[in-house]
């Protein structure tokens, strides 16, 4: 069978995965293949990394080759480390194969070593072409056609050591595996009052070690960027002794695999174990997680990043010699780019510069230049060290008798991350000599004086729990006299409201009543926490990541069962109220064929047409199953049973149609690593604003907004003009730009048909 493409000049695009495998690579490969075919070009799967490029292990990709791969870990096309490609002769052999197959556009998915090799190939490409032509191995026509190699890189590495990118493919899933493992270890450690020393991967980058330490409330962490001095055993044992005196029954110590002390001497898990046993006489166990960190299904975030980076990489390599606008050109040669994640945006940065900066950071770490190494890693890396110091180091003094009081209340539906934010806010406040009270069960708790004193000790372990430890309620503040009395009786000097759209509305109501109640003239901060992701002022709310990981797990199971069953059409309903965020992200990350949301109008005729197309694709064998993700608030006229009736009428009992309402299971169990560490970051940021309102600017009633990679204070008053109160959503939603990718990645274009 031969694949035919639409008329016009077509290009050959090669995609390979190289180096260590990482979860999310398959999502990127799928995206590259389908977007290339959608644009009418040839896509080649280069198997086994650079070995396949040298040996000609290359296959023309078809649309169906990348069906049902998004949920799989590892690399579907194989990956390897290739010593031969490090040589000039090896790269020339690879170039000869590429000229032979007319592959002049290459997308490489891998770590810094793999991308460095790709950059070297691009630099030598012109010379290789001239030599191959002179040797008579390629014609003049082929030499002219391939005079330039269009190259794009995608960082696929669990180490997340690439400078200029917030995340690399695989790092988020690796953190999931680490947190899952340590959550399990904590239970057994607590039973026996043991200490666990956990070794994690990361090579010369401490991202995994440091981020995991924050998420699991580790007592101590070793990572390469800050090598400890020779007195580290005393410091470690003092820390463990302090938390034991406060009643903690277990301890977790995380050790990055590339850690040395300030003199360059390797620190290993056995050495840490022996020091603790000798000095504290505690029972210590070692857990080396190893390749477990690379295994399992990809997380939601790695699926989404892989899809988006693959799509952007295709746009980069195919922008063509004809397109000059926006392209960076040196003479006749375009500059290779690497896809980098910044906040929720994908940027295309110069590959050679990113490689140099990554090499520089690694060299500074090897030279043990801590300050410069941490600065090169970015401000977020420095902030994490600060957060860890405050939330893990016990109080050195008792709380003063007279102090300020800050209050925390949870509003709306419970979700993951609420407790993590409360935990970090409480510990930051206690370190500053400020007491914190938790208002139980929403505003009713404040009116009924149902509050609880939160201390450094009694919030221990909260970051690892989902839901709301304080109790939450869907309600807005009413009976303002009782609200004011509750604040006055507890001498509240600052208030944190954790929740979704109702939390934002609550802050707005309190601010509007300040002229009547002086006790409301206190700093107020909203921490957005809702799986609907409809809180204004932020790109992402707490709880979203945990919910989407749970949804992906369930949809994967439903999809698998649909393949081997007569029930080929699955209508899956997600939460989200009037916001279609969950449905859109679910469709993108699970390979679903359609997302039905309020923000994109769909009527009965559209659904009838969709059902007819679906039946035709199922009949032809080009589709194994059809997944339709419907947001619960997608329409007030067409509900899931109505969608089923439309499909049933078209399918005529040939294919079964089933509805699955995921319900409250979407809220998830233990919070994901992202929600834990982001909750802790937001809790710290909330404290910084309340204790020093000048940081919040002219307004002292703000939402903590995740904008790009940073957390900012966004005034509540201004946000009131940017939302639809009727439907409880912001007017502008960044994620709507991604919605067209649902169809682009699943609907095979007519121009790319298979002929027998």
From Swiss-Prot:
Residue ranges of the region described as N-terminal catalytic PFK domain 1: 1-393
EC number(s) stated in the UniProt entry for this protein: 2.7.1.11
Compartment(s) where it occurs, according to its Swiss-Prot or TrEMBL record: Cytoplasm
InterPro entries xref list: 6-Pfructokinase_euk, ATP_PFK, Phosphofructokinase_CS, Phosphofructokinase_dom, PKF_sf
Any GO molecular function: fructose-6-phosphate binding
Broadest EC class assigned to this enzyme: transferase
GO cellular component: 6-phosphofructokinase complex
Keywords assigned: Allosteric enzyme, ATP-binding, Cytoplasm, Glycolysis, Kinase, Magnesium, Metal-binding, Nucleotide-binding, Transferase
Biochemical pathway: Carbohydrate degradation; glycolysis; D-glyceraldehyde 3-phosphate and glycerone phosphate from D-glucose: step 3/4
Binding residue positions for Mg(2+): 112
Function: Catalyzes the phosphorylation of D-fructose 6-phosphate to fructose 1,6-bisphosphate by ATP, the first committing step of glycolysis.
Residues binding beta-D-fructose 2,6-bisphosphate: 474, 530-534, 575-577, 632, 658, 664-667
SUPFAM superfamilies per the UniProt record, alphabetical: Phosphofructokinase
Cofactor: Mg(2+)
Pfam families reported in the protein's UniProt record: PFK (PF00365)
Subunit and partners: Homotetramer.
Record text on activity regulation: Allosterically activated by ADP, AMP, or fructose 2,6-bisphosphate, and allosterically inhibited by ATP or citrate.
Name the UniProt record assigns to this protein: ATP-dependent 6-phosphofructokinase 2
């Amino acid at each position: 069978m031969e694949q035919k493409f639409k008329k016009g000049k077509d290009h050959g695009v090669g995609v390979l995965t190289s180096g260590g495998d990482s979860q999310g690579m398959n999502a990127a490969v799928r995206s590259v293949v389908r977007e290339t075919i959608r644009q009418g070009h040839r896509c080649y799967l280069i198997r086994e990394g650079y070995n396949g490029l040298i040996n000609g292990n290359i296959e023309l990709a078809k649309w169906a080759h990348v069906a049902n791969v998004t949920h799989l870990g590892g690399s579907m096309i194989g990956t390897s480390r290739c010593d031969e490609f490090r040589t000039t002769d090896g790269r020339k052999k690879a170039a000869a194969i590429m000229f032979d197959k007319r592959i002049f556009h290459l997308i490489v998915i891998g770590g810094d070593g793999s991308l460095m090799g790709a950059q070297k190939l691009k630099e030598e490409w012109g010379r290789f072409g001239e030599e191959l032509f002179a040797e008579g191995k390629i014609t003049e026509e082929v030499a002219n056609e391939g005079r330039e190699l269009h190259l794009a890189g995608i960082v696929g590495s669990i180490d997340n050591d690439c400078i200029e990118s917030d995340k690399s493919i695989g790092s988020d899933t690796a953190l999931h595996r680490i947190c899952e493992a340590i959550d399990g270890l904590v239970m057994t450690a607590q039973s026996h009052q043991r200490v666990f020393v956990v070794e994690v991967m990361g090579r010369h980058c401490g991202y995994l070690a440091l981020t995991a330490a924050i998420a699991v409330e580790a007592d101590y962490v070793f990572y390469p960027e800050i090598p400890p001095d020779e007195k580290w055993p005393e410091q470690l044992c003092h820390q463990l002794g302090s938390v034991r005196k406060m009643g903690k029954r277990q301890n977790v110590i995380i050790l990055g695999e590339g850690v040395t002390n300030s003199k360059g001497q390797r620190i290993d898990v056995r050495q840490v174990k022996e020091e603790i046993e000798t000095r504290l006489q505690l029972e210590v166990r070692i857990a080396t997680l190893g390749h477990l960190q690379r295994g399992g299904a990809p997380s939601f975030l790695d699926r989404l990043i892989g899809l988006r980076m693959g799509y952007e990489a295709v746009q980069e390599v195919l922008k063509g010699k004809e397109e000059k606008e926006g392209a960076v050109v040196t003479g006749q040669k375009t500059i290779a780019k690497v896809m980098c994640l910044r906040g929720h945006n994908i940027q295309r940065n110069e590959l050679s510069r990113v490689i140099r900066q990554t090499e520089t950071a690694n060299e500074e770490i090897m030279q043990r230049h801590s300050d410069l190494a941490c600065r090169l890693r970015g401000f977020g890396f420095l902030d994490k060290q600060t957060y860890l110091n405050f939330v893990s180091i016990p109080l050195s003094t008792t709380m003063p008798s007279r102090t300020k009081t800050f209050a925390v209340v949870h509003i709306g539906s419970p979700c993951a991350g609420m407790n993590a934010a409360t935990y970090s806010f409480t510990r930051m406040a206690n370190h500053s000599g400020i007491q914190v009270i938790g208002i139980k069960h929403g505003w009713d708790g404040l009116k009924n004086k149902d509050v609880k004193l939160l201390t450094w000790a009694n919030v221990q372990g909260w970051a690892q729990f989902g839901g709301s430890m304080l109790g939450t309620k869907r309600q807005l503040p009413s009976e303002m006299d009782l609200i004011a009395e509750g604040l006055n009786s507890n001498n509240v000097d600052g208030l944190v409201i954790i929740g979704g759209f109702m939390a934002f509305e609550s802050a707005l109501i309190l601010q509007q009543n300040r002229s009547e109640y002086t006790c409301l003239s206190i700093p107020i901060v909203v921490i957005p926490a809702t799986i609907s992701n409809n809180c204004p002022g932020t790109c992402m709310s707490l709880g979203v990541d945990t919910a989407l990981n749970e949804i992906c797990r369930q949809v994967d199971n439903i999809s698998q069962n649909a393949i081997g069953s007569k029930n080929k059409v699955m209508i899956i309903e997600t939460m989200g109220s009037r916001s279609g965020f969950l449905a859109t992200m679910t469709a993108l990350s699970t390979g679903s064929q359609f997302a039905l949301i309020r923000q994109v109008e769909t009527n009965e005729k559209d659904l009838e047409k969709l059902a007819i197309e679906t039946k035709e694709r199922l009949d032809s064998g080009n589709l194994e199953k059809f997944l339709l993700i419907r947001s619960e608030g997608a329409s007030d006229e067409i509900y899931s049973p109505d969608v089923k009736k439309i499909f049933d009428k078209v399918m005529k009992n040939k294919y079964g149609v089933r509805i699955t309402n995921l319900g409250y299971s979407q809220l998830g169990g233990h919070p994901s690593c992202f929600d834990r560490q982001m909750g802790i970051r937001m809790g710290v940021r909330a404290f910084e604003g309340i204790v020093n309102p000048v940081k919040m600017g002219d307004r002292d009633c703000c939402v903590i907004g995740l904008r790009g990679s940073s957390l900012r204070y966004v005034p509540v008053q201004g946000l009131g003009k940017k939302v639809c109160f009727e439907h409880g959503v912001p007017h502008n939603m960044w994620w709507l730009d991604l919605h067209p990718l649902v169809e682009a990645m699943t609907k095979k274009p007519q121009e790319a048909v298979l002929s027998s």
